[in-house]
């Protein structure tokens, strides 16, 4: 056994090495590239060191030359002439004469305290107290006695003949065409729209409480003998969709086994009158989306009949309880994966009934489904052992 394992390991190693030979060239190429990079870095370092040594050598030579020039007494600042040429020339600004040296061309009569900003063409006789902002276009003939407090908003078109004693509280909106002989005791609140043609003989005792909402168009043909007991809420269209099969017990002689495809081998001991065995609290809609639940899982978890016998009423009831949410007018999957099982569906005539009101005997159709015979535990174990042996043989040989 160990010998076979050793041979298998060596052969696997050789096989892998032969299979992946093409990657070896890439590895050597990578090593060569890394080596070249190292050489390049070394070359760059050497070049940098050489340049640095040359720089320091030049500096030492310059310091040595400067030292020798000083010892010989030479002007080591001889290069300053070039620096002077590069400097910008300084421009000499004009200087103002000092206070002790007055300008010989200055006016000897100028007031030393005079305003330097005075207009030279100004009138020398101007009133020093005059308003500097006076209107140059002012009227020279203005009344010197004019009221300085006059109303600037006064009406310039006022009537010069107006009565100076006029009532200040007079109505400015008075009607100029009003009757000057009007009765001063007249009622100021009289209705100007009063009807001048009112009947003087009108009944002063008219009923002030008359119904203003009386219907002037009352129907004179109304039926005074209408039936007081008529049902005002009667619905003539009560249920247009009434289910003619609503009463499952309508026909006492109904044949619950009317299905022409019924299994002639049905259990003769089944109780067809046992009601409400398959009733549940499922959804009411026949096209319930939950009908798409994993029916295969339900089928796999259903009762298995290892003896290949026909299912009993107990098995049928358990299966109906498991698939009550997915019941429809289509046949359900077989209740078992091997052996004999059951398939159920809702009768087409009972499709509109709620699922919790379905009758086990009258609303549910049943039929037997036969699957392959169930394998025993011994067969399963033997199959597993055989598979393991085959795999071991393939990998070890």
From Swiss-Prot:
Region of interest: Disordered: 69-313
Which residues are glycosylated according to the annotation? Answer: 337
Tell me the keywords, alphabetical order.
Cell membrane, Cytoplasm, Disulfide bond, Glycoprotein, GPI-anchor, Lipoprotein, Malaria, Membrane, Repeat, Signal, Sporozoite
Which Cys-Cys disulfides exist here?
A: 334-369, 338-374
Q: Where is the composition biased (Low complexity)?
A: 101-273, 295-309
Q: PTM comment for this protein?
A: During host cell invasion, proteolytically cleaved at the cell membrane in the region I by a papain-like cysteine protease of parasite origin. Cleavage is triggered by the sporozoite contact with highly sulfated heparan sulfate proteoglycans (HSPGs) present on the host hepatocyte cell surface. Cleavage exposes the TSP type-1 (TSR) domain and is required for productive invasion of host hepatocytes but not for adhesion to the host cell membrane. Cleavage is dispensable for sporozoite development in the oocyst, motility and for traversal of host and vector cells. O-glycosylated; maybe by POFUT2.
Chain positions of sequence repeats: 101-104, 105-108, 109-112, 113-116, 117-120, 121-124, 125-128, 129-132, 133-136, 137-140, 141-144, 145-148, 149-152, 153-156, 157-160, 161-164, 165-168, 169-172, 173-176, 177-180, 181-184, 185-188, 189-192, 193-196, 197-200, 201-204, 205-208, 209-212, 213-216, 217-220, 221-224, 225-228, 229-232, 233-236, 237-240, 241-244, 245-248, 249-252, 253-256, 257-260, 261-264, 265-268, 269-272
Q: Name one Pfam family in it.
A: TSP_1
Which stretch is the leader sequence? 1-18
Q: What sequence ranges are listed for the domain TSP type-1? A: 322-375
Q: Where in the cell is it found?
A: Cell membrane; Cytoplasm
Instruction: Reply yes or no: does the keyword Cytoplasm apply.
Output: yes
The record gives the membrane topology as: Lipid-anchor; GPI-anchor
| Propeptide residue range(s) | 375-397
Q: Where is this region: Region I?
A: 93-97
Enumerate composition-biased segments (Polar residues): 274-290
- Give lipid-anchored residues (GPI-anchor amidated cysteine): 374
Family named by the database record: Belongs to the plasmodium circumsporozoite protein family.
Domain topic, free-text comment: The N-terminus is involved in the initial binding to heparan sulfate proteoglycans (HSPGs) on the surface of host hepatocytes. The N-terminus masks the TSP type-1 (TSR) domain which maintains the sporozoites in a migratory state, enabling them to complete their journey to the salivary gland in the mosquito vector and then to the host liver. The unmasking of the TSP type-1 (TSR) domain when the sporozoite interacts with the host hepatocyte also protects sporozoites from host antibodies.
Q: Write the protein's name.
A: Circumsporozoite protein
Gene source species: Plasmodium falciparum (isolate 3D7)
